[in-house]
């Protein structure tokens, strides 16, 4: 919808998105598969929940791993939001907060665990070539994502 409404061409290179890839190529970039790495994290850390951030973004996927009375506070700026999401927000005139409800904003997986295990999990994922970081924390609040 954003592509058609904004009059964009899938066969055009948009410099703010990519220096050399056409819009269509960027939008068709395949999803990473994390199964082996996540299983290793589960084996070595005290994992409380795993959420694959798909359609519905943060707001629909993270609550699935929260217990009753819990919410999640996202630390915006703790990871780099990819140019594709920045461009979609601008081109589609989508409110910034709504972007997190529609897209994964570059976060494919959220793994909930005690803070004490986070660095170990990050190291395991880095060993497999995945960039991981702490993006927030569990808070009190009924399925609230802030």
Where are these regions (language model features)?
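Glycine-/charge-enriched secondary-structure boundary and capping motifs
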Residues: 9-146
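Mobile "lid/hinge" segments at catalytic clefts and subdomain interfaces of large enzymes
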Residues: 1-10
